[in-house]
Amino acid sequence: MYDRAPRFTQLTLSSTTSEIGPGTYNINRSLGGDRGSYAPFLSLSIRDSGFLGSASALHSPGPGQYNSDITRNHVLGGNSLQNRSKRFDDVLSDVPGPGAYNVTNDVSPARKIKAKSPKITSKAVRPSLSPAAPSIPSPGQAFGYEEDAQGVLHKHKVPSRDHSLGPAFYSPAPEELWSSQKYKGVQFGKMSGRREPLKGADEPGPGHYELQEDQTVQYENVNVKREQRSRSELSIPRYHELVPLQEEKKGVPGPGQYYIKSQFETSSNTHRPAQSPPFLSQAQRFSPVKDETPPVGAYNDPRCALEILKKGRALNKNPFGQTAVRFLPENRSKATPGPGAYNMFGYGLAQESLKKASLQSSRKAAFGSVAQRRIFLPSKEEMSTPGPTQYKVEKTNEALYKKQSTAAFKSASDRLVVSLFAKDTPPPGSYNVSQSFEKTQCLHQYSKPRNENARKRQSCFLSAASRNTDVLHNDPHTPGPAYYSPDVKSSSTLALIISKEDRFKDPKDEVPGPTAYELSPVIMDTVLKGTFNVTLHNPLMSSTRSLSSHRSWRKPTAHSSA
């Protein structure tokens, strides 16, 4: 680390150093001397050139031997647009156009055969049918006629028509440029080829041998090093150095925190009389806008007394040896009353006046003064002076319109109704909320009837059926009650609609209950079953004996009657 030997920062890429080159060789000595061996560098091994990566690179093709069409067709990166066919092909109709028909001039061979067959010609002279131009020419006769020297009309032939397709029917494939087929994105992300590193031979080359050591002395300027040391460098403290610096900075007070006493300050008089509150009131003039109601959980609930046991009992380090609370919260649970701790009847006019009277009696001074008030004893001169009510003030004549009373000032009723005091209203527990809610919001329950006649009549008014049903329509053809015969009973057709019986009745369980069974009189009053133990008194045996004796007593009567 502290060695002064030169460091080689740049290494040569080839197998030779920069000391070997043109001008460094001694040609005369090499030509004149005898060669001891024809092998270069005393070695007959094959040396690979450093410019060729491997021997296989010699057999690789040159730059003009590649087929560029393959690379043009294979566009890297354009995977989403592989289909080059047209989305909408040109619609070509298969129906021939108006000039696509070819009308032949020769007569069909069937007509020629008919013409050659011998026919019976009539002796009557037929007029010669000379072709004439038709009034409405067909498409084959629309090119005109030419009159011969003999006056025979010859039809013009149809001109030769070019049947090749026009320019609208061609669809040549446009030759796409190679620049338009290239992928415009990043290409190096998809390359998989690697560049072979250029490695030289492992054998040492000429010039790598140091036959003579370099013993030159290197000089260093000490003054230059001192100038470099004096330069200011950025010093960033580490974490273990930064922590004590921050802790030392906390104990130093900031600017403006010093309080220097001045010699011109007014000394505070501690013996002056205490100032009483103005207007004999100690109430706060301007109450804060902030709501003073305690938040949720601020009450001292005795149910939370076991939470103290959850806290740790380890002794905390008290600052300055004090255990008092330094910062008291604004809303303390002790100062705020809990739910149900308010006294509604204690805050009234009588309580406030009693509080003011006791407060004024305890104070000695009035109007904020502590000086002793002397007793007022008037002298003779002061007694002779008239008082405030002994003067006679002359009454001025008022206008007549001021003496007349109007309706606004003549009425003795209050214009603004004063709200009732809180003490006149009943407390919140005096109302029966449950009964009032059931009568107003729930179903109305009628009072019970007082006698039996009222109980019979009550069923008429408690019916939920409509009195005037919409089912019975007024029909003039329907007979009235006087048209019916009392002997014939007519069955009403609307019985299914007017009937109030339930369509779907509740299923009744037809299984007999526990009281439906009848026990025999023998086992009715006992739970004991038959036993073979003679020592126990078995009531069954006595009952069976009585029954057998009763039967034997009735049998001879039957024989005697017979």
From Swiss-Prot:
PANTHER family per UniProt: SHIPPO-1-RELATED (PTHR21580)
STPGR repeats sit at 21-31, 60-73, 96-118, 204-227, 253-271, 336-350, 385-409, 425-462, 478-492
Q: Name the domain of life.
A: Eukaryota
Provide ranges: composition bias, Basic residues. 551-562
- Gene for this chain: stpg2
Q: Read off the InterPro entries from this record.
A: CIMAP, SHIPPO-rpt
Q: Key word Hydrolase present in the record? A: no
Does the UniProt entry include the keyword Cell membrane? no
Query: What is this protein called in UniProt?
Result: Sperm-tail PG-rich repeat-containing protein 2
What are the Basic and acidic residues biased-composition ranges? 193-202
Low complexity composition bias: residue spans = 127-136
Q: Which cysteines are joined by disulfide bonds?
A: none
Chain residue ranges for the region called Disordered: 114-136, 192-215, 543-562
Q: Specify the species.
A: Danio rerio
